[in-house]
Amino acid sequence: MLTLTRICAVSYEVRSTFLFISVLEFAVGFLTNAFIFLVNFWDVVKRQPLSNSDCVLLCLSISRLFLHGLLFLSAIQLTHFQKLSEPLNHSYQAIIMLWIIANQANLWLAACLSLLYCSKLIRFSHTFLICLASWVSRKISQMLLGIILCSCICTVLCVWCFFSRPHFTVTTFLFMNNNTRLNWQIKDLNLFYSFLFCYLWSVPPFLLFLVSSGMLTVSLGRHMRTMKVYTRDSRDPSLEAHIKALKSLVSFFCFFVISSCAAFISVPLLILWRNKIGVMVCVGIMAACPSGHAAVLISGNATLRRAVTTILLWAQSSMKVRADHKADSRTLC
C-alpha cells in the first residue's frame, strides 16, 4: 500500500530544543537507574546477600540504562544524521531493533517482579498455588537467567527476520497545482514486520504481568475487608507492603502502555509518513517513561530511600562546611 507523504523540513530551533530535552531525559534517566544499580551492586561488592527483589531491581536498572542509551542515540540520529528525504539508514534501524529487544527484556523483568510480589504477599489456600509461590521465591535467579536467554534468542530471531527479507523501494513523484512535490515511498517494510514480530514475544510476559498484578489487587481488597472486620489499626505492615507493591506495578503498567503506544505510533510516522516532528515527540515520551518508573521504585524501596537520605545529608553537611569555611576566611581577612 502506497502512502502519500509530504516532505517538510524541521527547523534548527525544533531540532535544538528536541536535543536539549533528550539530553535532560538521558541525564535524569541515567542518574536514577545508575543510582539503583550502584546501591545494589555495592551490596554485592560488600558480599552482603541481596534479596530477590533487589536482584530483579539490579537487572531492571541495567536494562533501563541500555534503553536510555539507545533512545539518546536515536535522538542524535534524528537531529543530525537521518534526513526526511532519504530512506532509513542501517544504524538507525539497528538502534530501533535493539530498543525493541531491550524493552522486551524490561517487560520480562517487570513480570518477574510482579510474580515475586505475589509469592511474598499473597496468602494462598490452594496447595498448588502454595507450591508455585514457594518455587518462584526459590528459583528467582534461574528466572533471571531465563529472561537473559529469552532476550538473546529474541535478538537472534529479530536480526534474522530483519536481514532475511528483501529490501525494496517504490518511489513515485506527483506534482500538484501548487507545484508541491509529494513523495510516495515505501522503504524497508521488513523493519515494520520485524517490529511486529518482536512485539508478539511481549504478549506472554505482559499477560503474566497482568494476571499476577490482578491477583495482588484481589489480595489487597480481601486483606482490607478482613482489617475492617477484625481490627481498626490503619498501620498494618502487610497492607503497606501490598500498597507499595501495587504502586510500583500500576506505575509500570501505565508507563509501559504509554511508551508502547508511542513506539507503535512512531514506526508509521517514520517509515510511511516521514513526519520527523511526530517521531521526536514519540521518542521524548518513550525516554521519559523509564525515568518515571525508576523514581517510583526508589520511593517505594526502603534500601534506596535510605541511600537517598544518606546522600542528601552528606550534601547538606558538605555545603554547611563550605559555608563555614568561607565565613571563617572572611573573618580572618
UniProtKB/Swiss-Prot annotation:
GO molecular function: bitter taste receptor activity; G protein-coupled receptor activity
SUPFAM superfamilies documented for this protein: Family A G protein-coupled receptor-like
Segments crossing the lipid bilayer: 18-38, 56-76, 95-115, 143-163, 191-211, 252-272, 277-297
Organism per entry: Pongo pygmaeus (Bornean orangutan)
CDD domains: 7tm_TAS2R38
Location(s) in or outside the cell: Membrane
Gene encoding the protein: TAS2R38
Additional remark text: Most taste cells may be activated by a limited number of bitter compounds; individual taste cells can discriminate among bitter stimuli.
Residues glycosylated per entry: 178
Classification via InterPro entries: TAS2R, TAS2R38
Keyword Transmembrane helix: yes
Classification via Pfam families: TAS2R
Name of this protein: Taste receptor type 2 member 38
Extracellular side: 1-17, 77-94, 164-190, 273-276
Keyword Protein biosynthesis: no
Lineage: Eukaryota, Metazoa, Chordata, Craniata, Vertebrata
A GO CC term attached to the entry: plasma membrane
